[in-house]
Amino acid sequence: FRGRVLGVAVKSFLPNYREFYELRHFRPASALPSDTLDLLGQKDIPVGADLIFEAEGIPGFRLFCEICEDLWTPVPPSCYAALSGATVAVNLSASNVSTGKADYRRALVANQSARCIAAYVYAGAGAGESTTDLAWDGHALVAENGEILAESERFSRKPAVTLADIDLGRLAGDRTTITTFSDAGGRTERPPFRRISFPLGAPSGIIPLARTVPRFPYVPSD
């Protein structure tokens, strides 16, 4: 962030089935020997799967990062992060292409955002990273509380950015209204999280919305 490493998010669950053999080379977050590291001339950088990045100047923006397979597990780490206050979960992924997987991935992202009453931002490896063994499609998704707000074109060979407006106020309101969310937070045993503040600040001036407000917001579209 602006020339400084705020923290290093580590993968919690490593797949070791079918075409995946990550445990041959890597270890999960639970095997970390320390909760800090020295990197790029910086000392004592927080490292782990327990980091929530909190933006100063933008109320309600608390970001958690998980990696690829973490989303495919029965209880993704982002569930615990959401119960600990995270409102936006991001997933840096290298989920390869197979028949029907895009629909399954889309459903996973939408459902996880609904379960956590959060935004979920998913960014997959691009087609240019494909090899003779596996192929990737550059699938990117932005979901908010069960709704897909934006989705990338798959298999694009051109650089692209997938953007969406996320309503943090709505998420806060929904979490307050849905009492079972706070009930789950009180009943669920979850690991402690470290919060890392950074001075993002809200942009100045008027910024056009990329998200339209429906004329009849209380009438279902279907």
Please tell me what each predicted stretch does.
Residues 1-222:
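Enzyme catalytic cores with a strong preference for nitrogen-chemistry domains
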